[in-house]
């Protein structure tokens, strides 16, 4: 279950626990009052701390969401927020760079020249610092934005990256359903995503590369059979010529990404490198382009 710090109280935590919820994810974003004010959040740093402490009274499985790349956020402010999440007992931490959405106050401020666009180099440095702090504290990075102590990886997150169907309940919630030939995402009664089999295969490769374990040679071969119309056998790393088609070669795409240092191949799997995660748009875009 997800909650914001300003709405989470100790009695609510007890009630949620009694209902059978086994994990709480808190949208903290920062433990710095100035940064929270810039974001326009309804909670302050002390409320965030209180929410994490309240959650830990009942839940062992507590996750904290943090953001980097926020205007006015110093490197030390962000690093201290990561350290504080660990100190408060979170066993799962997700770190996201600020995304400027169209028609938002930040977007308007940038258009007026009142604010600079997020610095991608600064965001990358912040993500690397978060990784260092969390790994030193015993966390491991199991997917692009999330770190967990062993046994506390999010099954919810993993379901997205492994193509598991899901049901969304409530306003703006998204449902994903699929069969062998079609994948659809539906929001508020409207189809917002409708993929054919080739696009599904490309998306599965892209989603798989959001996880540390990446994708196996067997997964790549199966995707190639669908995307390039090439039936392949076994799970070995096949020659690029076997996958060539007018739409591009699946294995050639991975080889190109490897040449760029964005992926690596070992032990029968293709995995993203740290550089690949930092350059996610290039990595994911190349795989999605296999079946536009």
Stretch-by-stretch model annotation:
Residues 2-244, 292:
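C-terminal scaffold of the Radical SAM
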Residues 133, 256, 286:
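Solvent-exposed, charged/polar functional surfaces in cytosolic regulatory/catalytic domains
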């Amino acid at each position: 279950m997800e909650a914001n710090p300003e709405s989470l109280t100790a009695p609510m935590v007890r009630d949620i626990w009694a209902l059978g919820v086994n994990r709480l994810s808190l949208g903290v974003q920062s433990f710095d009052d100035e940064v929270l004010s810039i974001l326009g959040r309804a909670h302050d740093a002390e409320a965030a701390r209180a929410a994490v402490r309240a959650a830990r009274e009942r839940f062992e499985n507590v996750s904290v969401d943090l953001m980097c790349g926020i205007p006015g956020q110093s490197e030390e402010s962000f690093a201290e927020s990561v350290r504080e999440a660990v100190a408060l007992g979170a066993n799962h931490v997700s770190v996201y760079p600020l995304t400027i959405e169209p028609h938002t106050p930040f977007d308007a401020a940038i258009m007026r020249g009142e604010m600079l666009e997020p610095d991608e180099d600064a965001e990358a440095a912040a993500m690397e610092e978060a990784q260092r702090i969390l790994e030193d504290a015993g966390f491991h990075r199991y997917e692009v934005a999330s770190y967990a102590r062993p046994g506390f990886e999010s099954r919810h997150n993993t379901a997205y990256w492994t193509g598991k169907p899901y049901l969304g309940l409530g306003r703006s919630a998204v449902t994903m359903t699929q069969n062998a030939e079609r994948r659809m995402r539906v929001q508020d009664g409207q189809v917002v995503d409708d993929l054919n089999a080739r696009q599904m295969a490309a998306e599965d490769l892209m989603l798989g590369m959001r996880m540390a374990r990446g994708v196996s040679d067997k997964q790549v071969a199966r995707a190639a059979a669908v995307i390039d119309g090439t039936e392949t056998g076994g799970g070995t790393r096949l020659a690029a010529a076997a996958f060539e088609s007018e739409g591009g070669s699946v294995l050639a795409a991975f080889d190109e990404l490897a040449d760029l240092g964005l992926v690596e191949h070992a032990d029968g799997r293709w995995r993203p490198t740290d550089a690949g995660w930092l350059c996610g748009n290039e990595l994911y875009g190349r795989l999605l382009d296999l079946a536009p």
